[in-house]
Swiss-Prot record, chain B:
An annotated Gene Ontology molecular function: molybdopterin synthase activity
Assembly notes: Heterotetramer; composed of 2 small (Mocs2A) and 2 large (Mocs2B) subunits.
Pathway assignment: Cofactor biosynthesis; molybdopterin biosynthesis
Entry protein name: Molybdopterin synthase sulfur carrier subunit
Residues where 1-thioglycine is found: G90
Gene3D superfamilies in the record: 3.10.20.30
Modified residue annotations for Glycyl adenylate: G90
Predominant place of localization: cytoplasm
NCBIfam families named among the record's database cross-references: moaD
Keywords: Cytoplasm, Molybdenum cofactor biosynthesis, Nucleotide-binding, Phosphoprotein
Protein family (similarity comment): Belongs to the MoaD family. MOCS2A subfamily.
Superkingdom per UniProt: Eukaryota
Gene Ontology cellular component annotations, sorted alphabetically: cytosol; molybdopterin adenylyltransferase complex; molybdopterin synthase complex
């Protein structure tokens, strides 16, 4: 049953519980709104309610029927509102509902108090300490007039879409969800990457790779191509790096040594690799080292072998004696052929020593 | 308000601040049988001195709120209007 009332006396909570009671109900929910003694720091001396009675009751009944349509199992609903002066800390409104299970009772009461504050024509005036006029309160949930401040009647205007401002026509609006957007961005990034890679290949590829080879598996760094092994019946693809520049490809680069020597040598712009040029090359530094070490110089030879020979010589001499350099002979062949023998310590027997001492004695006798 | 049609006399109720400004809880007013809500509001505001709270007022006709101020309202003799400032129940 719906119990809706505007009262002028203190609300009797016990009576309301009686109204809610029912054998089939396991739950009742009661909301009590009480008056506060302060608002925004001001002390409330007294407050009073007034209502548009007939319409207030009508709206409160509408709330009850709303509740019943949303929560079917509600048994009893009570909405009591007190009017006139209400002393501080007393109940001004009580909303209650009972139902078999608690969720309906709890939710419906919460909904009902919100609705009451929005729709029911009741007003409260508060009188504050030090202010004789008092103030009519306003619920933030209260219904408000819908028109704009300017009073402009939008409904009377024909609808016209403004296209000429803000958005440039070159822009397109795409409405997609996050997953789609991420996917599109990813595709774009990948495509751009591939584009850059293929551009790199075109920019950096070496001239000796035939241009009609398939470059899809190539990037600018490896220049790899697919070459099928000759006389191979295998249908597996063999990928071999066709790198003509590395030191492992020496046999394919007969002029490699020459080119390397060119790198080591002068940068005076002479590009003609003749013997004459080589002679005048200031590999003179290496020549100087070699002659000092007592080695033969041969400008024809690979520069690395020459350096290696020098290193070997150094190691050898160091192993002999650390002060070798003061005794270096300038005939390399003889030096190489007969390295100085190491002095070996000889151990003498007792008889040899005796004989030796005897000899000395004999010699000293002659002196 | 243009008196280009039949006019009826209706009751007007004032509440809260509007009652203080109008200085009376109820009165009567002549209205055409058909009028837009905006015009009605303007008429009431000017007649009863409610200009200061005009933008916050809602009207109720026969205990039903007039939600849109562009609505057309049809009056009969003896209808009840109410001037409703923002609510503060609960």
């Amino acid at each position: 049953m719906d119990h809706v009332k505007l009262v002028n006396d203190p609300i009797d909570i016990a009576h309301i519980h009686q109204l809610l009671a029912d054998e089939g109900c396991g739950a009742s929910s009661v909301f009590v709104g009480t008056t506060r003694d302060n608002f925004q720091g001001k002390k409330v001396l007294s407050l009073a309610y007034e209502a548009y009675d007939s319409m207030a009751l009508k709206e409160m009944n509408k709330i009850c029927s709303d509740l019943r349509s949303k929560w079917h199992d509600l048994k009893h609903i009570v909405i009591y509102h007190r009017l006139g002066t209400v002393p501080v800390c007393e109940a001004s409104v009580v909303i209650a509902a009972s139902s078999p299970h608690r969720s309906e009772a709890l939710e419906s009461v919460s909904f009902a108090i919100d609705q009451l504050k929005t729709r029911v024509p009741i007003w409260k005036k508060e009188i504050y300490e030090g202010d004789n006029n008092g103030e009519w309160k306003e619920n933030k949930e209260s219904i408000r007039p819908k028109k704009s401040k300017s009073g402009f009647n939008y409904a009377a205007c024909p609808c016209k879409v403004e296209e000429s401002h803000d958005v440039p026509r070159t822009l397109v609006q795409i409405r997609v969800n996050d997953a789609e957007l991420t996917k599109r961005l990813e595709c774009f990034v990948n495509r751009k990457r591939d584009e850059i890679n293929s551009q790199n290949v075109v920019d950096f590829k070496s001239s000796f790779v035939s241009s009609d080879k398939d470059l899809s598996d190539s990037c600018a760094r490896t220049q790899s191509t697919i070459i099928k092994q000759e006389q191979s019946n295998c249908h597996l693809k063999v990928r071999r790096v066709n790198n003509r520049c590395g030191p492992q490809q020496m046999e394919m680069r007969p002029n490699y040594e020459l080119e390397l020597n060119k790198l080591m040598g002068s940068r005076d712009g002479q590009t003609d690799p003749t013997k004459e040029m080589r002679k005048s090359l200031p590999n003179s530094r290496l020549q100087a080292i070699e002659s000092y070490m007592g080695l033969t110089t041969d400008n024809e030879e690979n520069i690395f072998s020459r350096i290696k020979r020098v290193e070997n010589r150094l190691l050898q001499l160091e192993s002999i004696s650390p002060e070798y350099k003061h005794f270096t002979k300038r005939e390399p062949s003889s030096m190489e052929a007969a390295p100085p023998k190491k002095i070996r310590k000889k151990s003498y027997s007792v008889q040899e020593l005796s004989a030796f001492i005897q000899k000395i004695k004999n010699v000293s006798e002659f002196i | 308000m243009n008196a280009d049609g039949p006019v009826v006399n209706v009751h007007v109720l004032f509440f809260a601040k509007s009652r203080e400004l109008a200085n009376t809880p109820r009165s009567t007013v002549d209205v055409p049988t058909e009028i837009t809500a905006t015009e009605l509001l303007d008429h009431l505001v000017s007649k009863f001195g409610l200009t200061s709270i005009r933008d916050n007022l809602i009207l109720a006709h026969n205990e039903s709120y007039i939600d849109n101020l562009s609505d057309r309202i049809l009056f009969k003799e003896g209808d009840e209007l109410a001037v409703i400032p923002p609510l503060s129940g609960g």
